[in-house]
Swiss-Prot record:
Belongs to the gamma-glutamyl phosphate reductase family. This is Gamma-glutamyl phosphate reductase. Its EC number is 1.2.1.41. Pathway: Amino-acid biosynthesis; L-proline biosynthesis; L-glutamate 5-semialdehyde from L-glutamate: step 2/2. One of its GO terms (biological process) is L-proline biosynthetic process. GO terms for cellular component: cytoplasm. SUPFAM superfamilies: ALDH-like. The keyword NADP applies. CDD domains: ALDH_F18-19_ProA-GPR (cd07079). It catalyses: L-glutamate 5-semialdehyde + phosphate + NADP(+) = L-glutamyl 5-phosphate + NADPH + H(+). It is found in: Cytoplasm.
Amino acid sequence: MDVRSMARQARAAQRQLELTSPEERNAALEAIARALEARAGQIVAANRADLAAAEEAGLPGPMIARLRLDEGKLAGVIRGVRAVAELPDPLAVEPQAWIRPNGLRIQRVRVPLGVVGIIYESRPGVTVDAAVLCLKAGNAVLLKGGKEAARSNAALGEAMAAGLQEVGLPVELAQVLPSTREAAQELMAARSLVDVLIPRGGAGLIRATVEQSQVPVIETGTGVCHVYVHRAADLAMAREIVLNAKCSNPAVCNAAETLLVDREVAAPFLAEAGPALLAAGVRLRACPEALAILQETARPDLAGAGPAAVEPATEEDWAAEYLDLCLAVKVVSGLDEALAHIARYGTGHSEAIVTGDAGAADRFLRSVDAAAVYHNASTRFTDGGEFGFGAEIGISTQKLHARGPMGLAELTTYKYVVLGNGQVR
């Protein structure tokens, strides 16, 4: 079946879902969780086949890591489904209401977006995470995953269909599209049938979707995130923040990719942070000034880390989203240069300053144009769960409709209900 036909079916199914109660939608999520549990063996086996094919094709290690969906990760996905069911219903919000002088009663009520398309790469868990968020908010969803996860996504889609069928809802509410480039092109062209498209993946995928899609796009994800160590920073605190921002999960979009350090504290800070980063397996790409400091202060650590552990940074490094244990390091003259660097190379995701100077922190927080800005905390907190929103569909780096972690509320819009008694204008 072609994508436009699948989108038409999704539109019809969504109209049916829109009439259901919160309790009915939650029952559907619980049925999906049970179906995933019942089919866990088939899902994990399908994922093993995807992993074997990926290794044979020589895909990069970080991509293979993102592709993996073993028993433990699948159990986490299932817990996530049940956690979404426990979240407050985004449509059951008390409407804003007012009465006009002519007697018209106007209400602004929350409604689903409609049909949501998701284009994503190697993470099969996104198939379920995205689907249940969309369903909870009253939307149908079309899921276009990467070809490297085709078997996993198909198995997950079959389980979700079984869950929907169990509670009497249309299986067309959550459809896994073919993993072909043609399917992606058809989805991006389905403007009258798909209400919004959300790409989740690397910079290339997001850029291609934004440039080619005729469907409105919410741009997510690309995270060239910076941690700036100001001259008034607590250096021990800064060291722990940098280690967490880079090393706790380097393959995600809220991980730090560039470290900026004020010249006044560069030598003592890099003397402590450099060896700690190298010990954690991080490769450093440093400006000339940082390189000289690292080569002098971290010489014993460099001897054990290998020749590629610290190298001169290139222009490409400042704009790189490594998604790996690699960090660009630059010494700056002060706050002005740090702000200019972030304005030039940042992607509007998450930016952090470490400082004890309230004035410098305030200027940084006001000046940096990003979805999330931090003072004395790791960029790794840019996450729906960490912000208290529950699960998220992605992290928006644009300004219209949604910005930052996108929870259930961001999968809705509103309409006006106007109640009259014969008024004319």
